[in-house]
């Protein structure tokens, strides 16, 4: 029981603040043409073999990390809505991945901005994240989203 309580407390300490809302792309007519970022293929069997052969005491691997450089200026699709608001969207695909988690090394939202991460069929929504999620070091870690 003690382990469960400790994990619960740690999880609570690092919980992400979200505000009520839904993505504007859900309620406005938007284009289906969105830039797709394709991650390199993952060889799950190879990763499992590496984990099996890892030296004792090696930390548990929770995923394969790919360094990328996507930003509002060099990727994604900008769209102006009928009401004048602007939205930016980027699809991220990773073949054979069980889930996708995203770590941002520069994350800053101005007041009034909302940020969402959602799956293709729009049944899972993470967010809205807002300026309340800005950190002193500008880092932000997106909770893993499990995919089919």
Predicted regions span which residues?
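Domain-level representation of secreted and single-pass membrane ectodomains enriched
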Residues: 16-148
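Bacterial Sec-dependent N-terminal signal peptides
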Residues: 1-21
